[in-house]
Amino acid sequence: MSKPVLVGLHLGFAIIGIDFFLWLLGEFIAEPVKRFRLRIVAFIGLAGFLLSWIIGGYYYIKFYGPLVKPIIKAGAAPWAHAVAMETKEHVFLFIIPMALTALFISFLSKEQFSNSKLKLPTILFIGSMVAVALAIGAMGYIISAAARWS
């Protein structure tokens, strides 16, 4: 697969993950009677993040490391790799465990969820996960822009 296709798939699946976890956030705020939809939404969000993770990793090994990174480091914005990519390389590790946690929470019964007083912590947790994913996306944009500036 070509670089643009991989980058597009990486971004597209990340957007699916973000969108579905925003949907999940709304579901937890609304406290649905039917819990099945929570599980489906959380699973699709997790799948989006997993596919983005795998495709991004393949792109990193196949293209970024050998081709793009040297261009960025020699270009007009070498800090893009030193700051944005180095941060992204570590922060992205949190996304899958966070998504799995949200999925596991979605499997609690309505009674378990209510009795555990998890509504506010879950809303804050999912909101934080979405914020982390959006920050990773912003870092990806910075890195991509730095490659184009060079």
What is each residue range found by the language model?
Residues 1-150:
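Polytopic transmembrane helical bundles with strong interfacial aromatic enrichment
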